[in-house]
A protein has these predicted regions:
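Conserved HGGG/HGGXW glycine-rich cap/lid loop of the alpha/beta-hydrolase fold
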Residues: 7-59
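Active-site loop/oxyanion-hole signature of alpha/beta-hydrolase fold enzymes
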Residues: 50-91
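Gly/Ala-rich beta-loop-alpha elbow adjacent to hydrolase catalytic centers
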Residues: 92-96, 100
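Flexible "cap/lid" loop of the alpha/beta hydrolase fold
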Residues: 101, 105, 112-146
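Conserved alpha/beta-hydrolase catalytic His-Asp/Glu region
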Residues: 149-198, 204-205
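Short beta-strand/loop motif that positions the catalytic acidic residue
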Residues: 209, 215-217
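Acidic catalytic loop of the alpha/beta-hydrolase fold
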Residues: 220-229
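Catalytic histidine-centered segment of alpha/beta-hydrolase-like enzymes
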Residues: 249-264
Length: 277
């Protein structure tokens, strides 16, 4: 299995396709298998598509430390350096959007373009007050079991998918649910990743981003994040990040890249208009 030695851990990664490099940063506790559902096949036709397991997930090392956005970003920088990539398109979904934002701030020379998809607001709401962050996941795991808890993030229409797509494409829903569960680790590792959400101020850090940026979100992504929603965060990010673009994809909820191909086409359009030098 391909892995990069980064500091005191190993990060599992895969590369698919040729062309300008695109780094895909996953949400908290999502193994890289999930990108194989639609996203890698779409992007790898034109781009060198790089996916990886964050520390604590999949095949990567599972230390008991380093679960914060800055460290996740440092791990990504280490992976790019290991692959001898001097600049890449950096794309992140949900918590992954915070990770690539942190990379763009700490090491802007490595980031040709930045795409923040369906990111949370971080430690503050869109109005700037501290976000309510009560971890109820342990209660849900105890009530329903770990597998049902994990798959439940995908197998629904109230948060994940628009009902029409969900009913017409059950194979996509099942494939994504299977990929999310396939290499899950443990409730303890899940807890580490949940706590990482409390370590980054997405909106507060937004003005520090100086690279071409696409803010991407489903127009129907109203999942409650303790006083904020991804679509509300997206609109605010577009106001705060200089010269950024906002793309709200119609008829799409939180599964941005999987609830139809609208977000993938928006991403491809942005990347084509911003080739790496």
């Amino acid at each position: 299995m391909p892995s990069a030695n980064i500091g005191d851990i190993e990060i599992y990664f895969e590369e698919h396709g040729q062309g300008e490099p695109v780094l895909l940063a996953p949400p908290s506790w999502w193994p890289s298998d999930t990108w194989h559902v639609g996203v890698v096949p779409f992007l790898s036709r034109r781009y060198r598509t790089i996916i990886f397991d964050c520390r604590g997930t999949g095949y990567s090392s599972k230390p008991n430390h380093g679960y914060n956005i800055d460290q996740f970003a440092q791990d990504c920088v280490g992976l790019l350096e290991y692959l001898k990539i001097s600049r890449a398109h950096s794309v992140g979904f949900a918590l992954g959007g915070q990770i690539v934002q942190a990379i763009a701030i700490a090491r802007p020379e490595l980031v040709g373009t930045l795409t923040i998809a369906a990111a949370g607001a971080g430690v503050k709401t869109t109005s700037g007050v501290p976000r309510e962050t009560r971890n109820s996941d342990d209660d849900e795991i105890a009530a329903h079991g770990f597998e049902r808890f994990i798959r439940g993030h995908i197998e629904n229409t109230h948060m994940a998918f628009e009902r029409e797509f969900y009913e017409q494409h059950p194979e996509v829903v099942q494939a994504l649910s299977d990929a999310l569960w396939k290499r899950q680790t443990s409730p303890e590792q899940h807890r580490h990743h949940y706590e990482a959400r409390r370590t980054w101020d997405t909106l507060g850090n937004a003005p520090r981003v100086k690279v071409p940026t696409l803010i991407l979100c489903g127009a129907g992504d109203e999942v409650n994040r303790g006083g904020s929603t991804p679509v509300g965060t997206a609109r605010r990010l577009a106001e705060l990040i200089p010269n950024s673009e906002l793309a709200l994809v119609p008829n799409v909820k939180h599964m941005t890249f999987w609830d139809g191909e609208g977000a993938l086409h928006a991403l491809e359009n942005f990347l084509r208009r911003h080739p790496l030098p």
